[in-house]
Amino acid sequence: MKVYTKQELNTHSQSLTYDDISLIPTQISKIKSRTEALTNSNFLGLKLNVPVISSPMDSVTGLEMAKELSRLGCIGILNRFDSSLDSLLNSKNGRGIKAVSIALNTDLKTIEKIVEKKYMICIDTANANNKEVLKKTEQIKKKFDVKVIVGNIAHGESLYQLEDAGADAVRVGIGSGSVCTTSIQTGIGIGQVSSLLNIYHIRNEKKIKIEIIADGGIKSPGDVAKAIALGADVVMLGRMLSGTRETPGEVIKYNGQLWKKYRGSASFGVKMRNEFIEGEETMVAYKGAVKNVIDGISDGLKSSMSYMNCFNLDELRKTETFAILSNSSYLERLPKM
């Protein structure tokens, strides 16, 4: 069996996803217990306990989720549709959250209020390879001292332009979200592993100072570990956090089971218009407190690090031992009940 480096995966002939690869532990691990593996990191000047950011979707990150993730040492990006945003920006307090998403047409007065609260800004668009995104980023960075996240991209060719515009971090992934139908509807997109590696290598080769957010396609703590091992600074989660107590919306009881709504940002439920739809809407099982999900991610990530002999995330990002899985090899690892 061939053991692949990042560079070899990057030049692989096919587009790869998380399910196509696996990490290979080749060293004798010196980690006695997974508790020795540290998942803390620094993202755009913020200290995180776990490298997790919530997606600014209206069914994932409202004010309650943003505050709780902040308390847990993660980042929740308050979605731009949230009804509490105006009162939050006009209040004297407004603390407890770290980031807010905006649209391309968000006015400078609103942005100024966001900056005064010392929040990060996420320009929430489906495609950052767009001159309007570059123009908005440049406008914000020239006028304000604030960290700006842009997205999304699937290839690294535009990193130079994004850096010139002042972007501090970029969301990587087009069409890979669980309720996103962009790739099907438009024919656009690359497997997340291939996207991450392409952008990671271009960033390093050209010494571009933009942080990488792996956004989409992550279904498990193992996928989080893979994303970090592939060079991501943090991961952005939607589906994994959906259905938790802190997500917006009511808990619904149906057939004796508790559920909550989960939908894509370009779904009909969000747009409420009969225009081109690139997202789905569904119900997910109620999961209880988001703390349980974050704890599970932290435990799984630490366990992966202990296998890989990595005491911290910087060491995990230096991973150069990967396997490409056949379909049968992937199916073999699934539980058989």
Predicted features and spans:
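Active-site entrance/lid segments in N-terminal catalytic domains of soluble metabolic enzymes
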Residues: 1-211, 241-244
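Alpha/beta catalytic cores of nucleotide-metabolism and tRNA/nucleoside-modifying enzymes
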Residues: 1-29, 165, 187-214, 218-337
